[in-house]
Swiss-Prot record:
Name of the protein in question: WUSCHEL-related homeobox 7
This protein's record includes keyword Protein transport: no
Homology family: Belongs to the WUS homeobox family.
Molecular function, one GO term: DNA-binding transcription factor activity
Species: Arabidopsis thaliana (Mouse-ear cress)
PANTHER family hit by this protein: WUSCHEL-RELATED HOMEOBOX 1-RELATED, WUSCHEL-RELATED HOMEOBOX 7
Pfam families to which the protein is assigned, alphabetical: Homeodomain
Biased composition (Basic and acidic residues): 98-111
Length: 122
């Protein structure tokens, strides 16, 4: 506990295999078990992107068998996973676009054209 009354949490205190539960030090962050991650990933790969409130509750009840979990953990897992997938797609499409620009030799790039032009006579 700090002098201001805030609880200071060290990283790694929740590295147990029961999803952050247990009798050890209390941790404010959910640490999913391998089984929980596998089930969530399988649902995501099957096409579930934005589960409804009912679906979230059913999923969290199912996942609670493998360790401590709350509905908000499921909600945020899907939100984060969807955002990371979008980010990855954007990064891949940007790389493909840049690569296509670098390998397209049929049209000279603007900066190359300017560099090789003769100075204007005046």
């Amino acid at each position: 506990m700090s002098s201001r009354g805030f609880n200071i949490k060290a990283r790694g205190l929740c590295n147990n295999n029961n999803g952050g539960g247990g009798t050890g030090a209390k941790c404010g962050r959910w640490n999913p078990t391998v089984e929980q991650v596998k089930l969530l990933t399988d649902l995501f790969k099957a096409g579930l992107r934005t589960p409804s409130t009912d679906q979230i509750q059913k999923i969290s009840m199912e996942l609670s068998f493998y360790g401590k979990i709350e509905s908000k953990n499921v909600f945020y897992w899907f939100q984060n996973h969807k955002a990371r997938e979008r980010q990855k797609c954007r990064k891949i499409s940007t790389v493909k676009f840049d690569h296509r620009q670098d390998t397209d030799l049929s049209k000279p790039r603007r900066d190359n054209v300017r560099r090789h032009q003769l100075p204007a006579k005046g």
